[in-house]
């Protein structure tokens, strides 16, 4: 049971960060706008996107190499702490913060279960 939940969490996390990261790397208009709102250059947002895509790959590879998955998820969690901090600095409401909060909860759940695998 735990393994199937871990696989499901890894898949959800990987898809979310692959899509978000690719959007930042491609500098789609909504990401350019958000970068400007939080005071980041588009280049900085692209680098964050690279980290997100790498983290997504690391979480998936963590299904075969558990310590890698834990490290990747921990790195993504640090990115999310930064994202939540950016939301708070902008005085965003719950609606704007919900995606970041949901992904943070997924990462915490993944880490909780994955620690038992290493």
Per-region residue spans from a language model:
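Membrane-interface extramembranous regions
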Residues: 1-118
């Amino acid at each position: 049971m735990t393994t199937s939940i871990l696989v499901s969490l890894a898949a959800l996390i990987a898809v979310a960060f692959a899509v978000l990261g690719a959007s930042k790397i491609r500098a789609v208009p909504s990401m350019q706008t958000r970068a400007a709102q939080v005071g980041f250059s588009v280049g900085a947002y692209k680098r964050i996107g690279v980290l997100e895509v790498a983290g997504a790959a690391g979480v998936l590879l963590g299904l075969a190499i558990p310590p890698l998955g834990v490290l990747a998820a921990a790195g993504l969690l640090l990115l999310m702490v930064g994202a939540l901090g950016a939301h708070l600095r902008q005085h965003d409401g719950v609606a704007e913060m919900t995606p970041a909060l949901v992904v943070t909860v997924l990462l915490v759940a993944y880490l909780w279960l994955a620690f038992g695998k290493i």
